[in-house]
Amino acid sequence: MSGFLASLDPRRVQWGAAWYAMHSRILRTKPVESMLEGTGTTSAHGTKLAQVLTTVDLISLGVGSCVGTGMYVVSGLVAKEMAGPGVIVSFIIAAVASILSGVCYAEFGVRVPKTTGSAYTYSYVTVGEFVAFFIGWNLILEYLIGTAAGASALSSMFDSLANHSISRWMVDTVGTLNGLGKGEESYPDLLALVIAVIVTIIVALGVKNSVGFNNVLNVLNLAVWVFIMIAGLFFINGKYWAEGQFLPHGWSGVLQGAATCFYAFIGFDIIATTGEEAKNPNTSIPYAITASLVICLTAYVSVSMILTLMVPYYAIDTESPLMEMFVAHGFYAAKFVVAIGSVAGLTVSLLGSLFPMPRVIYAMAGDGLLFRFLAHVSSYTETPVVACIVSGFLAALLSLLVSLRDLIEMMSIGTLLAYTLVSVCVLLLRYQPESDIDGFVKFLSEEHTKKKEGILADCEKETCSPVSEGEEFSSPATNTCGAKNLPSLGDNEMLIGKSDKSAYNVNHPNYGTVDMTTGIEADESENIYLIKLKKLIGPRYYTMRIRLGLPGKMDRPTAATGHTVTICVLLLFILMFIFCSFIIFGSEYISGQSWWAILLVVLMMLLISVLVFVILQQPENPKKLPYMAPCLPFVPAFAMLVNIYLMLKLSTITWIRFAVWCFVGMLIYFGYGIWNSTLEISAREQALHQSTYQRYDVDDPFSVEEGFSYATEGESQEDWGGPAEDKGFYYQQMSDAKANSRTSSKAKSKSKHKQNSEALIANDELDCSPE
């Protein structure tokens, strides 16, 4: 019926084809083979990025991008206005939430190590082109605002050290810019403009130069941190933590402070953007992400302890808390020492925002989603110099015209959105069949690869010892190549995998879903948490798994289970969004203990738990990576919940500005990117190739009769017997009747050839029989 209606209305066919074409474009994914180890990534001008970053360099970048504003600004702000001395607990909660997203980032950094676009690249190869552009575009906004805010913060720091003489001179000489910032004294910050330009030049000069500069500032910041810890011990007073003063605003203040403290950990994703420039990204990226978060947590907690023990929480200065806490005790010289650390820390934070921004632009321009001239890599500095200059200029312009307070309000929404998407991608990929994640799972864990190579090498070194006949027949299992030196049964299982004969049965549900030669991945050493759980529960562990419907070790994901996980993750995201919205905007009904509000919260929590449990029941892909996020699906699901909650805590004006930025991005994507992406150009070339040359089916068995052309009745040899190259376009436009006639002729010739062959075989058998 639908075909009949379509034949009556050609516009229906046109709209359907247009929708299908647009749908396929926005959901197309980038093949990952070009980004795997050994392939390298080359810019549009043929120059590769330099691979010079070590694990220490990556840790330094991660720490520097976080610790500046967190230690010198956020600690005092949260302690005074939200949590009091409980800011320590707030930082710990925020760190746990950040680590949840960090482990997901670490797994993606191992899956696609040779990348420059962080969450943009991860989403491009998993979710699709449109979502990838959306995430990349908002990461650019995040880094752009972070750079401008860092330059403005440094300008304010210098102005504070100069007793605000710089700002007064600006207002008296240049004037104010009413409307661009909050307050009547908003002025064009020329000092912030100069700072942004200088840092842009440093980043554009080369990775090694900028990272070296970053390392020097981090060492200086570390020295100031040690000074604060030692000097502060002489002025601490335990009465400021007396009963009733540690949590002056209760646990609600601690949780509110945790939401603010979470922003102090934003920045570790810079590590994921440098994968192409890291010497060994497979191991460096996960280690650097974890280490940087732990170091930042240590710095924040220790500084918060000293701050709240030196000064009552209600007397903390929110603009420069660490400098003023020594002034309160008359130690004026320490103010300038801390000021040096503040300048170093804020400079590193500024560098941490500017460093990844041109690399995201470079990755998007290299894929054709942004203008391709932005992907130019300088052959001298081996950096995306055009992207550096353009992004640095925009950041400098923002720092000149927009106040620091307005910039800070938009700093987190893009990053939180990227964190959420990375958690979603981890959930999707771990439960998809192997055929759906081609390039991601083509390599094994380096540790197991080295272990296998060592076992095989040891086996080859052993010489074969002679064995007597008696030994050979009496012990058929004896190995003649030094069995005592061969690996144990567990090692053999690791090498060849346990045989699952049922999996080779065509009726087995997992038949054909995974390469049978890769049984090694399914029999890897189990997760340490599962081992502890087995010891705790005992034999009932397996009974419990069966009753809960959890998958077995040899179960493999199929297209059906992968689709189930995709639907569950989508519903989980929507339900979490509704749940967090109700918790935030309906808090008065919940606190008022309205029965319908409590019932709705319980119902949504129950539905979220059911969806997570359904995901848990699906089999995971058995491939192992050098680093994998633990405790799936709980860790990514909880990370999604925390990130969505923090996004909804942002102000309304932030969402409005975010919507305007997204609208500009959509104009660029649908006006330029979707038609000029590398995948679109490749698809056009492939379509042109298919329309120019006739494809032949080379899989059919060849017979002698097929080597010749037979003309059917009513059809001359001239019509189709000649070579295809001579027929050109008209050969491809052959009518269906002729094509069917030729197919029937070939089928008859094949049948005749088969009958002749069977007759010949029968005659040969008769000739060779003893009779």
Swiss-Prot record:
It is found in: Lysosome membrane. It comes from the Eukaryota. Residues 745-754 have a biased composition (Basic residues). Gene3D superfamilies: Amino acid/polyamine transporter I. Its main location: membrane. Disruption phenotype: Mutant mice exhibit slightly thinner retina, including outer retinal layer, and abnormal electroretinography at 2 and 6 months of age compared to wild-type animals. They are viable and fertile. They do not show any noticeable physical abnormalities. GO terms for biological process: gamma-aminobutyric acid import. It is a multi-pass membrane protein. The keyword Secreted does not apply. Residues 735-771 are annotated as: Disordered. Pfam families: AA_permease_2, AA_permease_C. Expressed in retina, brain and spinal cord. In the retina, expressed in the inner nuclear layer and photoreceptor layer (at protein level). Expressed in liver, spleen, lung, kidney intestine and brain (at protein level). Keywords: Amino-acid transport, Glycoprotein, Lysosome, Membrane, Phosphoprotein, Transmembrane, Transmembrane helix, Transport. GO terms for cellular component: cytosol; lysosomal membrane; nucleoplasm; plasma membrane. It catalyses: 4-aminobutanoate(in) = 4-aminobutanoate(out). GO terms for molecular function: gamma-aminobutyric acid transmembrane transporter activity. Induction: Up-regulated in liver in response to high-fat diet. The chain crosses the membrane at residues 58-78, 83-103, 119-141, 187-207, 216-236, 251-271, 291-311, 336-356, 384-404, 407-427, 565-585, 596-616, 628-648, 655-675. The keyword Transport applies. Glycans are attached at N282, N676. The modification Phosphoserine is found at S465, S468, S475, S488, S757, S769. Imports 4-aminobutanoate (GABA) into lysosomes. May act as a GABA sensor that regulates mTORC2-dependent INS signaling and gluconeogenesis. The transport mechanism and substrate selectivity remain to be elucidated. PANTHER family: CATIONIC AMINO ACID TRANSPORTER-RELATED, INNER MEMBRANE TRANSPORTER YGJI-RELATED. This is Solute carrier family 7 member 14. The gene is Slc7a14.
